[in-house]
A protein has these predicted regions:
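PRPP-associated nucleotide enzymes
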Residues: 2-260
Length: 260
């Protein structure tokens, strides 16, 4: 349904079963809002704790000075991660609010890059000689990743580990305008897959989304080596669903797994 100043119109006839966008809790839901009884802020906090629990198995030797949330919706999962791992929480980046609210919403890449540069102000004392684990709500096009790492390296950071609070986004949303891309190849994982295997790789999206597969590891290694991270990890779809706490059949996961 589209609501305007003059009324509303039906874009798509309603289905027979409820399907709520999983990204609602991860990214664009307001922190104080509750959907189906699940508060956005608390879901994001649980999401970070679940990532930390899984990381303890995947990276048992990892040791960082600070867990850092990328403003603004990366902060709650960072808090959950820090609490679960008994690690200090820090804010090396402060959001500069008089810019575009979301860096992935401008229509062209040049403008997205400019917004990404403008929207963060750094705190040098929380970066130099520190080992940081950054948590962001999602990685859609990767607009900020390379510039963030380059900046941190230039500022003397010792290590940079990156975590995404949602699974790899493999499909452009076909239902909501807020996340529609000009094409699937604007999505970072799809571009990487095309570079690694060409069109053949696009037939194995499920494998690339799974870090326990050879293709999944290839995707992570590409991001790690190309972007300059010391490690990179995504929340699993199962972990995200666990954090939300609603039956999977009531949630839309199309952008992650392509299932309608």
């Amino acid at each position: 349904m589209e609501i305007t100043a003059d009324g509303y119109k039906t874009i798509h006839e309603p289905g027979t079963e409820m399907k709520i966008c999983t990204f609602l809790w991860t990214y664009y839901g307001y922190p104080t809002a509750c959907y189906e009884g699940q508060n956005v802020e608390m879901v994001r906090y649980r999401n970070g704790a679940i990532m930390a629990r899984d990381d303890a198995q995947r990276y048992p030797e990892m040791d960082v000075d600070y867990v850092c949330g990328m403003p603004a919706s990366g902060i709650p999962p960072a808090m959950g991660y820090a609490h679960e791992t008994h690690t200090d929480l820090a804010r090396p980046f402060i959001k500069y609010t008089p810019t575009w609210l979301r860096s992935f919403t401008p229509p062209n890449q040049e403008m997205r890059n400019q917004v990404a540069r403008m929207k963060q102000i750094h705190v040098p004392g929380l970066i130099k000689d520190k080992k940081l684990l950054l948590v962001d709500d999602s990685i859609v096009r990767g607009t900020q990743l390379r510039e963030t790492v380059d900046f941190l390296k230039q500022s003397g950071v010792k290590e940079v580990h990156m975590r995404s609070a949602c699974p790899p986004i493999m499909h452009s949303c076909k239902y909501l305008n807020f996340s529609r891309s000009n094409g699937e190849m604007e999505l970072l994982p799809r571009r990487i897959i095309q570079e690694l295997e060409g069109n053949r790789g696009q037939q194995h999206l499920d494998e690339y989304a799974n870090p326990d597969t050879e293709r999944g590891q290839a995707l992570l290694n590409w991001i790690k080596e190309t972007m300059g991270f010391d490690s990179i990890g995504y929340q699993s779809l199962e972990g995200a669903l666990e954090a939300i706490g609603i039956a999977r059949c009531k949630l839309c996961t199309y952008c992650f797994d392509g299932k309608e």
